[in-house]
């Protein structure tokens, strides 16, 4: 059953038969921007109980979490769910705090971890990190935009410890060099 709600110029579609895990897997593994927007609306719908929601309803909930994590929401801007807006502003520190928070919430962490691309195995990391210590030891989401390249997630060190990390490269002229740098950082941390 599919229902839709229209608020202002934002429209979100809810498929009540699609699990959050299925949407999250598609969103994270393949960097599916449409599912990112849909999940943002689903967050708003779940938090408000409203049938008609806009992306703003989900953004309000994210801003509440930013405050709970000890950050000032005024320092950040979220304009969409997929990260393609020029008006988004997040920091690596905030992303790491989100990841640490998710780790502390068993059910959330299990869903998130399962959905993240795995270095050298699948999703947007399928062709990265092969033949290195990062192979199969990095579960992370890639992100790219004009002159920006990012990688954030979890990596498993040699001693078995999980580490939350976020790397953002700005003013990038070569996305390939930025990705190589990120992969090398992961290798170095894993090797410690």
Residue ranges and their predicted role:
Residues 1-8, 12-13:
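Single conserved hydrophobic/aromatic residue that forms the stacking wall/gate
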């Amino acid at each position: 059953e599919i229902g839709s709600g229209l608020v202002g110029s934002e429209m979100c579609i809810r498929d009540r038969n699609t699990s959050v895990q299925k949407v999250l897997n598609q969103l994270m593994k393949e960097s599916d921007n449409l599912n990112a927007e849909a999940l943002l609306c689903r967050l708003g719908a779940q938090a408000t109980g409203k049938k008609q929601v806009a992306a703003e309803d989900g953004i309000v909930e994210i801003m509440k979490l930013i405050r709970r994590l000890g950050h000032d929401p005024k320092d950040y801007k979220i304009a969409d769910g997929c990260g393609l807006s020029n008006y988004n502003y997040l920091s690596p520190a905030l992303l790491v705090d989100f990841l640490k928070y998710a780790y502390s919430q068993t059910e959330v962490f299990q869903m998130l971890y399962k959905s993240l691309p795995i270095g050298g195995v699948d999703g947007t990391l399928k062709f990265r990190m092969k033949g290195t210590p990062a192979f199969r030891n990095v579960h992370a989401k890639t992100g790219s935009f004009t002159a920006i390249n990012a990688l954030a997630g979890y990596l498993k060190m040699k001693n078995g410890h999980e580490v939350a990390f976020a790397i953002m490269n700005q003013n990038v002229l070569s996305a390939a060099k930025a990705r190589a740098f990120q992969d090398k950082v992961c290798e170095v941390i894993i090797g410690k």
